[in-house]
Amino acid sequence: INDYWDNPQLKWKEDASKAMQHLDVAGYNYMWYEYENDHQKDPLRIIYGSETVAQEAAVNWNLVEKHPYIIGDFVWTALDYLGEAGIGHTLELSKGEKNPQFMGWPWYNAWCGDIDICGEKKPQSYYRDIIWKEREITMAVQPLPAVGKTEDVSYWGWKNESLSWNWKGLEGKPVKVNVYSRAPKVRLYLNNELLGEQEVSKKDYTATFMVNYQPGELKAVATYDSSESSCAILRTTGAPVQIRLIADRKVIKADRDDLAYVTVELIDKEGRVVPDADMKVTLSVVGNGIIRGSGNACPTDMESFRSLSPKTFKGKAMAILQPDGNVGEITLNVSAEGMKGASITIRTVDR
C-alpha cells in the first residue's frame, strides 16, 4: 500500500489499518518510516517493503536485520524498463530550478533499475551487494557538478557515479570517490600512494573522499583494527583497439522463439573494457538467423532497436540474434572504425 497519494482525505495513522487487516502480509510502498510505529499498534502484523528505492536501501535493510516482523523488501526496480521516462534521472540544477518527476524526449526508459536494460549492474547494484553482505567493498567515482550548479537526484534515481577511473579532461581536478563497505574503516590509494583513511558510516556504509584525478590505479581497502582486508580497484584503460563479443549461450534451439544475446565490448590492448568509449559499431550476420534487435543501455539513445549500426554506451552494446528455424549456424560480424573487428558463431540445434 502506498501512502494515500490520490486520496488526501485519508490519513495513514487513522486509515491504514483498515486496509492492512485484509492482508496476511502487509506490503508498504516507500513507507519504511512507519514500520516501527505500526508494530506498536499491531504487534502481530508481518511487514515487507513492497516497493523500495536504491537511495533508501540501507535504511530498509537495516530494519529487516533489526526486526523479525519485517521480512524483506522488493526493489523498484531490479531492471530498467521502457516507460516512466527518466523517473530515475539525475540533473545538475541552478539555484531555483525545479527537478521534474519525469523527463521528456529523448528519454525513453525509466533509468531507475539496479541493472540496465542490457543486463549490466549499475553502481547502485554494487552498493546493494554491500547492504546484502554479498561483497566486502566496492567504490564508484562521482564527477563534481559544474560551477554554480548542484546535483539533484530524483527519488527513484542514483547519484551520477561510475565504476570507472577514466576521466579524460579532469586531470588535476577534484572528483568524489564513494567507497562502500561494512568494514569499520577504509583506506584509499592512488598509484600506490595512501591518500587517507576514513571511518565508514554505519548508517549508509559509505566513506567519501575528494581526490584530484590522475590516471592510473585507484584502490580502496577495507580495514579492521589497522589490518587490511579485501580491496576494490579501478584502473585507467588505454584507447579502444578491438571488439570483443560475448554470447549468453553459444548453442540455442533452431526455433524462432529462441534468442541469443551477444554483448559487444570495446576493449584496449590489455583486454579491458573502455568505459568512456561511445562509438558506432556495424553489425552484419550470415547463416541461419537474423539480427532481431540491437541497442545499448543509454536511457536517451533514440536509435532504433532494429538498427544495424548501434552506438556503444560505456564501452558496450548488444545484438540479439534470432534463428530462422533451421539447424545450422548464425555468425555475427561486428566492426568499428579504427579498430579490429570480431565475429562469433552461434549453433542452432534441433532439440
How should each PLM-predicted stretch be described?
Residues E193-K202, R292-S309:
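Solvent-exposed serine/threonine-rich low-complexity stretches and specific carbohydrate-binding patches
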Residues R256-V262, G328:
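Short, solvent-exposed loop/turn segments enriched in Ser/Thr/Gly
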Residues K185-E193, D278-R292:
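Extended low-complexity, serine/threonine- and proline-enriched intrinsically disordered segments
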Residues A222, L266, V334-A336:
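Conserved structural position at the C-terminal beta-strand
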Residues V241-L245, L283-T300:
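Short aromatic-acidic-glycine turn motif
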Residues C231-G238, K340-R351:
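Short beta-strand elements
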Residues T208-Y213, S304-G325:
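Short, hydrophobic beta-strand segments
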Residues I1-D257, K269-V273:
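Substrate-binding clefts and catalytic carboxylate motifs of secreted carbohydrate-active enzymes
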